Structure formats: structure tokens, C-alpha cells
């Protein structure tokens, strides 16, 4: 899947601040849902993490983006609150990979169903 990531903390003005990358498509386990990302927003946490936090493993990419709206693409075996095709919105966990990608894994317990009257960009904001 396509994603945007970085390997070294640096100012946003650096040439390699954000790099287009390819990552394996994640697979949901447990209570995770796989969301096809339709919109993300940038908040101060993204900016602060980008400037100060390296990836946990220097060989891996760090992906930001935790404010998300999208469509449930798959569910883990223990998921009870969501099904494939539902529209969702959430602020993901900073302890996990971010949503600046085509797909994002998130624990169902921090996800809400997106109101149908709200568009993708507004839902992610």
C-alpha cells in the first residue's frame, strides 16, 4: 500500500520530511479493524512527533496521522461493533503506526461510526 513516512526526525522544511513509500497492507487481528483511509488531518501531535521521534527500528519507516475518516475494509476475529463497509471516524493511538496511508489498523474500541451528513474531510478534522 502507499503511505507517507520518514526515517529521521527533522524540521518540516527538510527535503526528506515526508517520503512516498510502499508498505505491506496490514491485516487485522483481535479487536482491530482495517480502515480504507478516505481523509486525514494534521494536528499538533503530528508536527511534534515528526520533529522529535524516530521510528522504533531505524530500518523501518515512521508513519504519522491519527485523525482519520474512512471505510471499514476488514475486521479482526474479535470485533463486535463494526462490519465491512461501514463509515468510521476516530483519533488513533499514537503508540501505533499512523494513518497517512491507504489503509490503517485501529482498535475498534476507539472508533465511532461517522455521521452520514458529515463529509470525509470534515470528519477527519
Predicted regions and their residues:
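Short, solvent-exposed loop/turn segments that connect beta-strands within catalytic domains
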Residues: 11-15, 79-80
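Conserved hydrophobic/aromatic beta-strand scaffold that supports enzyme active sites
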Residues: 20, 25, 69-71, 103-105, ...
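Short polar catalytic/cofactor-binding loops
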Residues: 7-11, 40-42
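Short glycine/threonine/proline-enriched tight-turn/helix- or strand-capping micro-motif at secondary-structure
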Residues: 13-24, 53
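Short structural boundary motif marking the start of a folded domain
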Residues: 1-4
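NAD(P)H dinucleotide-binding glycine-rich loop of Rossmann-like/cofactor-binding domains
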Residues: 91-125
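Glycine-rich beta-strand-centered segment in the early N-terminal region that forms part
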Residues: 24-41, 51-95
Amino acid at each position: 500500500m502507499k503511505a507517507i513516512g520518514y526515517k529521521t526526525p527533522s524540521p518540516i522544511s527538510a527535503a526528506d520530511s515526508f517520503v512516498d513509500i510502499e508498505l505491506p497492507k496490514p491485516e487485522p487481528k483481535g479487536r482491530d479493524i482495517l480502515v480504507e483511509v478516505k481523509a486525514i488531518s494534521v494536528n499538533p501531535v503530528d508536527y511534534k512527533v515528526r520533529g522529535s521521534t524516530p521510528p522504533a527500528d531505524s530500518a523501518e519507516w515512521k508513519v504519522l496521522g491519527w485523525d482519520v475518516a474512512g471505510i471499514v475494509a476488514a475486521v479482526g476475529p474479535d470485533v463486535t461493533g463494526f462490519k465491512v463497509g461501514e463509515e468510521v471516524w476516530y483519533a488513533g493511538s499514537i503508540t501505533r503506526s499512523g494513518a497517512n496511508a491507504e489503509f490503517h489498523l485501529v482498535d475498534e474500541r476507539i472508533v465511532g461510526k461517522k455521521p452520514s451528513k458529515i463529509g470525509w474531510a470534515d470528519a477527519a478534522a
